[in-house]
Each structure stands twice: as C-alpha cells, then as structure tokens.
C-alpha cells in the first residue's frame, strides 16, 4: 500500500494514544535492539530515533499479529509476511502488557468488530438498530459476514 509521505509525517505529529522509549529490532537478519521513541497514533505505529522529530518508519497495524514473546518483550508480524518480525522490549512486564493490549486494539478491524458487537447488544436490548439514526446501517463496512440484523 502506498502512502503520501507528508500525510504520514503530519499523522506522526498528532497526539499519540501511547508513546514510550522502547528497545526495537527490525526484521532484517543481524539487526540489533536499539532504543527508539515509539508512538501509537490511530492504527499506525511510528518509530523515531531518540531526540528526532521525524519518524524513521511506520507500521500499519492491519492484518498483523501482536504477540507477547517473554516477560518484557512483544513482537509484531504481518500475516502475509510471517518471516518479517519486529521485536520490542519494554522496561517492565506491566508496560509490555499495556503495549500488547493497545496495539491489538488499534486495528480498524478490531474497532469495526467492537462496533458490531455493541450494535447487536443494543439491538437486542432496544429492538432498534443504533446506526439507523445516522443512515448508515446498511453500509457494507458495518456488516459482518455472518451477522443477522
């Protein structure tokens, strides 16, 4: 997927849902853990050299798996490229758990599925589709393959 560099740079400067200095190792063979400022903005994970304002890279958190590797470490790999694994090390076990949860919940697909779950719960309780008032209940992006509304 192609991205406009200026748009990504602008997005990287927005308020982060989560940010911290983490040790990070890229997917290339022989790469080593390096301290990076890591920022989660919407469904992008930006990483920066410490004390630099422009990101050196970004990961779109779609079609990927976030896995806890050990007490303080987690990884991100993409479903269509499982051999490409990004490794991260946190300063504590608690920080690691927080990052894994935040990254797992950041994808558009997770948010869409959450919306569908709560939409169905409201429909069961009230008998009304909460998206109808916005005129968007029939849009394909709000449909699950096996959902029956």
Curated annotation (Swiss-Prot):
UniProt gene name: plekhj1
Gene3D superfamilies named among the record's database cross-references: Pleckstrin-homology domain (PH domain)/Phosphotyrosine-binding domain (PTB)
Organism: Xenopus tropicalis (Western clawed frog)
Superkingdom of source: Eukaryota
CDD domains named among the record's database cross-references: PH_PLEKHJ1 (cd13258)
Source species taxonomy: Eukaryota, Metazoa, Chordata, Craniata, Vertebrata
Cystine connections: none
Pfam families: PH (PF00169)
All copies of domain PH, residue ranges: 15-108
UniProt-recorded name of the protein: Pleckstrin homology domain-containing family J member 1
SMART domains named among the record's database cross-references: PH
InterPro entries xrefs: Boi1/Boi2-like, PH-like_dom_sf, PH_domain
